[in-house]
């Protein structure tokens, strides 16, 4: 008995000492960091300042562009510019969007093909499974945060009569929307997939139906006479009697039928599916696919060189994009009342997910400080805020992760294009939150089953968003239809969607970036084995470009991201 008591006492003492030791180590680490910062400030010279400015020129210019753009927009609002004048003013920003969108298509295809071809099937399968688990977990958490925030804050309290409606929403049946998603995964024409997506359209046709009624009002449904008897005279008499005792009624009505159609825009989902399959096949044929492998690798390098040129224009474009959007707002007063509370709820939810959940996942898996990493992708985040498209931000995200943070290119070339297409944490959070907000303004009480339906539908619908601007409004129709909420009430939140769209795009891009770092950390063993195999003399040459990493950037990331 005494030995058992002593063991319990020793175990509790050990746990207490462990907790004290952890706190002490954390305190010592913070003190050492503060001391290093103090020494760095004391020994700072003009040369150090210039080196810092050169190293962070992109980020400083981009942040300055955002501040100047917002200030310039509010300074010009009193002049009440016309729509044409605002479009002229926003023209430099439109040029940036067109430049980035020009690079999206070749970048997605070349990066996915080279990334898949550089890994064997077993390593690709494991990486794909980890990416799928990460995407699903973060999306489900985002939906849960959105539901929790809108339930706690309850921004829809009151009547919707005071809310301003704006725009029109096309109603799309849920089944047709999901079938379009699957259809777009397998485009019949790859050339057409570069500029068009399949989208179900609807037409009406006139249907005529003849209804036969008897004297007592019963419906026979057809105008055929009763069967004839053996006696011709009796048969004729019965037919005359039947005709006199019946009434034919012709009904005509219009029926809405689905027909094949299309919508302008890159079919990113179909190109991703094809590129992944094509890259796996090239990797499987080994030496026979060397020419194709080298071609797509050279194409990817050329595209990244073009990104390096365009990136210097990004601050100018972002300045005019943000300023133009603020100038387009007709009335800033729409941000008050219920809509203001709704906007605040979305911002809080996105902040909790992007500033809390995603960094926590990064820290728990990699055991590194997540905030230097987030600082490394800051330019991609600001670009996402300006363009409101995770696909258009993809070239900048590649540059930040590969050249700035030294993430393995075999990981980024697989994770980033797929993530920009299907991993939409911010969109999923927004859709779940907005659906419950619309239920609240209609005084509609949702039960647990309906909230669960919203969660599942928002998670699935976010996959089909495909990184296009304001896709959340389109997929929102699916979520509302699943629980019978009025889809026309989406017009209540359109007035602030341009702003919230930028914030959720930033969340999407951050989720993709952290996902790439997490999957790289979990795939270290496969990457090292693959590198050892590919450095053999018989296989070395074709794969060397893929294994060339930015050593300086990698060392910078290792020095900055020290464990907390």
UniProtKB/Swiss-Prot annotation:
Pfam families: SDF. GO terms for cellular component: plasma membrane. InterPro entries: DAACS, Na-dicarboxylate_symporter, Na-dicarboxylate_symporter_CS, Na:dicarbo_symporter_sf. Its main location: membrane. L-aspartate binds at residues 388-390, 427, 468-472, 501, 508. GO terms for biological process: L-aspartate import across plasma membrane; L-glutamate import across plasma membrane; L-glutamate transmembrane transport. PROSITE patterns: NA_DICARBOXYL_SYMP_1, NA_DICARBOXYL_SYMP_2. It catalyses: K(+)(in) + L-glutamate(out) + 3 Na(+)(out) + H(+)(out) = K(+)(out) + L-glutamate(in) + 3 Na(+)(in) + H(+)(in); K(+)(in) + L-aspartate(out) + 3 Na(+)(out) + H(+)(out) = K(+)(out) + L-aspartate(in) + 3 Na(+)(in) + H(+)(in); D-aspartate(out) + K(+)(in) + 3 Na(+)(out) + H(+)(out) = D-aspartate(in) + K(+)(out) + 3 Na(+)(in) + H(+)(in). It is found in: Cell membrane. Na(+) 1 binds at residues 419, 423, 508, 512. The keyword Cytoplasm does not apply. It is a multi-pass membrane protein. The keyword Membrane applies. The modification Phosphoserine is found at residue 2. GO terms for molecular function: glutamate:sodium symporter activity; high-affinity L-glutamate transmembrane transporter activity; L-aspartate transmembrane transporter activity; L-glutamate transmembrane transporter activity; metal ion binding; neutral L-amino acid transmembrane transporter activity. Residues 1-55 are cytoplasmic. Na(+) 2 binds at residue 421. Keywords: Amino-acid transport, Cell membrane, Chloride, Glycoprotein, Membrane, Metal-binding, Phosphoprotein, Potassium, Sodium, Symport, Transmembrane, Transmembrane helix, Transport. Homotrimer. Sodium-dependent, high-affinity amino acid transporter that mediates the uptake of L-glutamate and also L-aspartate and D-aspartate. Functions as a symporter that transports one amino acid molecule together with two or three Na(+) ions and one proton, in parallel with the counter-transport of one K(+) ion. Mediates Cl(-) flux that is not coupled to amino acid transport; this avoids the accumulation of negative charges due to aspartate and Na(+) symport. Contains eight transmembrane regions plus two helical hairpins that dip into the membrane. These helical hairpin structures play an important role in the transport process. The first enters the membrane from the cytoplasmic side, the second one from the extracellular side. During the transport cycle, the regions involved in amino acid transport, and especially the helical hairpins, move vertically by about 15-18 Angstroms, alternating between exposure to the aqueous phase and reinsertion in the lipid bilayer. In contrast, the regions involved in trimerization do not move. This is Excitatory amino acid transporter 4. It comes from Canis lupus familiaris. The gene is SLC1A6.
């Amino acid at each position: 008995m005494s030995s058992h008591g002593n063991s319990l006492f020793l175990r509790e003492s050990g746990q207490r000492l462990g907790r004290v030791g952890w706190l002490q180590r954390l305190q010592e680490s913070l003190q050492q960091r503060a001391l290093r910062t103090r020494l760095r400030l004391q020994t700072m010279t003009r040369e150090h300042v210039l080196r810092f400015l050169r190293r962070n020129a992109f980020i400083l210019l981009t942040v300055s562009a955002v501040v100047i753009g917002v200030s310039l927009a509010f300074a010009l609002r009193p002049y009440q510019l016309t729509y044409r004048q605002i479009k002229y003013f926003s023209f430099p920003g439109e040029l940036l969007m067109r430049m980035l969108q020009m690079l999206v298509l070749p970048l997605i295809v070349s990066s996915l093909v080279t990334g898949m071809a550089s890994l064997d099937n077993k390593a690709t399968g494991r990486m794909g499974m980890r990416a799928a688990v990460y995407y699903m977990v973060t999306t489900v958490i985002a939906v849960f945060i959105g539901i929790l925030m809108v339930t706690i804050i309850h921004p829809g309290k009151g009547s919707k009569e005071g809310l301003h409606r704006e725009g029109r929403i096309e109603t799309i049946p849920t089944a047709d929307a999901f079938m379009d998603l699957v259809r777009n995964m397998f485009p019949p024409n790859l050339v057409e997939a570069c500029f068009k997506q399949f989208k179900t359209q609807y037409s009406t046709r006139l249907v005529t139906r003849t209804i036969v009624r008897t004297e007592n009002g019963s419906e026979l449904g057809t105008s055929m006479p009763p069967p004839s008897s053996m006696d011709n005279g009796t048969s004729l008499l019965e037919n005359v009697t039947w005709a006199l005792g019946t009434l034919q009624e012709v009904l005509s009505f219009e029926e809405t039928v689905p027909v094949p159609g299309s919508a302008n825009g890159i079919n990113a989902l179909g190109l991703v599916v094809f590129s992944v399959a094509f890259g796996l096949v090239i990797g499987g044929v080994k030496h026979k696919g060397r020419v194709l492998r080298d071609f797509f690798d050279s194409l990817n390098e050329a595209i990244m060189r073009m990104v390096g040129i365009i990136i210097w224009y990004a601050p100018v474009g972002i300045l005019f994009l943000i300023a133009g959007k603020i100038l387009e707002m007709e009335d800033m007063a729409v941000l008050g009342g219920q809509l203001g509370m709704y906007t605040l709820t979305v911002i809080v939810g996105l902040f909790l997910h992007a500033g809390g959940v995603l960094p926590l996942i990064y820290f728990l898996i990699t055991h590194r400080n997540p905030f230097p990493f987030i600082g490394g992708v800051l330019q991609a985040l600001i670009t996402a805020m300006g363009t409101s498209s995770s696909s258009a931000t993809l070239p900048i995200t590649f540059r930040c992760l590969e050249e700035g943070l030294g993430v393995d290119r075999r990981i980024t070339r697989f994770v980033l294009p797929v993530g920009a297409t299907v991993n939409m944490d911010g969109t999923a959070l927004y859709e779940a939150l907005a659906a419950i907000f619309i239920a609240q303004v209609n005084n509609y009480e949702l039960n647990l089953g309906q909230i669960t339906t919203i969660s599942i539908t928002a998670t699935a619908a976010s996959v089909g968003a495909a990184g296009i601007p304001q896709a959340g409004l389109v997929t929102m129709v699916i979520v509302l239809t699943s629980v019978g909420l009025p889809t026309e009430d989406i017009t209540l939140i359109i007035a602030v969607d341009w702003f919230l769209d930028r914030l959720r795009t930033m969340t999407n891009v951050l989720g993709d970036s952290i996902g790439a770092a997490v999957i790289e950390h979990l795939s270290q063993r496969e990457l090292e084995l693959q590198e050892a195999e590919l450095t053999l003399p018989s296989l070395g040459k074709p794969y060397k470009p893929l294994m060339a990493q930015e050593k300086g950037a990698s060392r910078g990331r290792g020095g900055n991201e020290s464990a907390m």
